[in-house]
């Protein structure tokens, strides 16, 4: 391992002037297809529009 990389890993977090340290390995997360997100958004928008016609706003 190069010495410059080793020095960067040994730097304490408090002395990094407020920089956030992100780790290389990510935890497994729920993966959703972009198509599912778009379709769900359209369905939600349509539901809100339909509900606004069915249920009148309070006076």
UniProtKB/Swiss-Prot annotation:
It comes from the Archaea. Belongs to the SEC61-beta family. GO terms for cellular component: plasma membrane. The keyword Transmembrane helix applies. InterPro entries: Preprot_translocase_SecG (IPR023531), SecG/Sec61-beta/Sbh (IPR016482). It is found in: Cell membrane. One of its GO terms (biological process) is protein transport. Component of the protein translocase complex. Heterotrimer consisting of alpha (SecY), beta (SecG) and gamma (SecE) subunits. Can form oligomers of the heterotrimer. Its main location: membrane. The chain crosses the membrane at residues 36-56. Residues 57-59 are extracellular. It is a single-pass membrane protein. This is Preprotein translocase subunit SecG. The keyword Ion transport does not apply. Involved in protein export. The function of the beta subunit is unknown, but it may be involved in stabilization of the trimeric complex. Keywords: Cell membrane, Membrane, Protein transport, Translocation, Transmembrane, Transmembrane helix, Transport. Residues 1-35 are cytoplasmic.
